[in-house]
Amino acid sequence: MPSRATVQEFSDSYPFCHNGFRPIMMPKIVSVQHSTRRHLTSFVGRKAELNDVRRLLSDKRLVTLTGPDGMGKSRLALQIGAQIAHEFTYGRWDCDLATVTDRDCVSISMLNALGLPVQPGLSAIDTLVGVINDARVLLVLDHCEHLLDACAAIIDSLLRSCPRLTILTTSTEAIGLAGELTWRVPPLSLTNDAIELFVDRARRVRSDFAINADTAVTVGEICRRLDGVPLAIELAAARTDTLSPVEILAGLNDRFRLVAGAAGNAVRPEQTLCATVQWSHALLSGPERALLHRLAVFAGGFDLDGAQAVGANDEDFEGYQTLGRFAELVDKAFVVVENNRGRAGYRLLYSVRQYALEKLSESGEADAVLARYRKHLKQPNQVVRAGSGGVRY
């Protein structure tokens, strides 16, 4: 018969199993360090926004950050999660749904974020409920907009069954649940945060970039022209390796005159981002554009092997040449670098990927790129997680 100490040690190892009614081998929730995503660029500004949302989360169990693409919803949510994780007994864990295309895979993707399998005889949602139970946990659920019904059903079930769970979501629109509090993410402050972000990202590609009386005015005008949209500012700042702020502003003004003329009225934030992507894309070299278009076949994250597999084409450049061009796309903010569970990963932001997919379709090489993509997925070491989706045209 096991000693009392042994029984206590086993019980402590499975804090989510209570009263003898949960499956005895229900796994323990993973630690914070194993369930979080880390960006490799610094988080800039948003002090007031961070304080506002933190205050909301102290009182509400479901808060949704809304706003158009490129406004920084994901970065804000992850930063808030990092700041308040210590307030939750079992920390926080993140689930990015950007790559999930099947509503039935949402709960499975959440288990994947925890690094947990579905328990035998239980559905994915029942496994989640059993794992979380009455533990105090923060769930950051990112990119819910294309799976609103599925997310609503799962979130409702989790909140009803897990009384100490708090959920922070991001979406272009509200989830639509009773008790949900929506908070629209604003543009960056044009007097401080937007300029600070531009300078920070400019120094990633040009370490000697300096702000003085002259450049401060121009950079401020660039940020104003871009309506304080973070992604648009990052794309523009990445051009300081070859263009001066004055040249960047002139190029943006030319592009926005076309957009405003077509719209017939003021340019919306969505149009601001689209125009900035188009302008920055036009400044890429031919091989860089070709590689970007090919990378768009990845609906979610990928690694360097994947980039080489789909990017290399004997007719224009080979696999070893892909790395240099890939590095240029990272420097120019077209490819996002993330540290996920200690491993470097890459992805395209939604608006960039959608534009690149259009260009890939126009190029006439979509079928060939898709063939290389499928061949890569069949390699022995490639594992496609549930819900990773496919190519979405």
UniProtKB/Swiss-Prot annotation:
GO CC annotations, alphabetized: cytosol
An example Gene Ontology molecular-function term: ATP binding
Disulfide bond annotation, renumbered to this chain: none
Record's keyword terms, sorted: ATP-binding, Nucleotide-binding
Top-rank taxon: Bacteria
Keyword Nucleotide-binding listed: yes
Binding locations of ATP: 67-74
Further facts: Was identified as a high-confidence drug target.
Protein name: Uncharacterized protein Rv0894
Organism: Mycobacterium tuberculosis (strain ATCC 25618 / H37Rv)
